[in-house]
Regions:
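Charged, low-complexity intrinsically disordered segments
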Residues: 1-155
């Protein structure tokens, strides 16, 4: 199985930090990350602060501080899916996503996010050979592959 395990370089467009105008709650955000972090709260002051964040990194930092909406755990996957559908709704972005072929998409990371992505873990076989595996739920990768398949089916 072929794997894209880094959303950097030529695959940066897969990252939630890459520029892509998406709308949430009538506001047009510069990245999926901005919109996702704003969606975590119902507090309009926090949403506005995230809207004006100068970078997706700053938006993510602010999102860690917001008072979470009560239903967040139940809706966060749906929110992300909706934002990703917007991001990959243009011809250019659909084409880029389709160009990943059938490769397995893994949001590989070193910061320990095993919900949206996966973390590379060193393992040892009984023969004392070292190998690496990805551990995590990889929800971002799964959503991207789902959307890619739906785009392919619509062709």
């Amino acid at each position: 199985m072929l794997v894209i395990d880094s959303f950097r370089g030529r695959y940066r467009f897969l990252s939630n930090f890459s520029p892509a105008i998406v709308v949430y709650n009538k506001n047009a955000y510069p990245t999926v990350e901005h919109a996702y972090q704003a969606a975590k709260t119902l507090d309009e002051d926090w949403q506005e602060a995230i809207f004006w964040a100068k970078s997706p990194t700053e938006a993510k930092r602010l999102g860690r501080k917001v008072p979470l909406r009560e239903d967040w755990e139940q809706i966060k996957l749906k929110v992300m899916e909706d934002l990703l559908r917007q991001k990959f709704s243009t011809f250019e972005m659909k084409s880029k996503l389709l160009a990943t072929g059938n490769e397995h998409l893994v949001e590989g990371n070193t910061w320990g996010d095993n919900f949206w992505g996966a973390v590379k873990v060193k393992k040892l076989r009984f023969t004392y050979q070292t190998y690496y595996t990805w551990e995590g739920k990889n929800h971002l990768g799964k959503l991207l592959m789902k959307i890619r398949e739906e785009i392919r089916e619509d062709l």
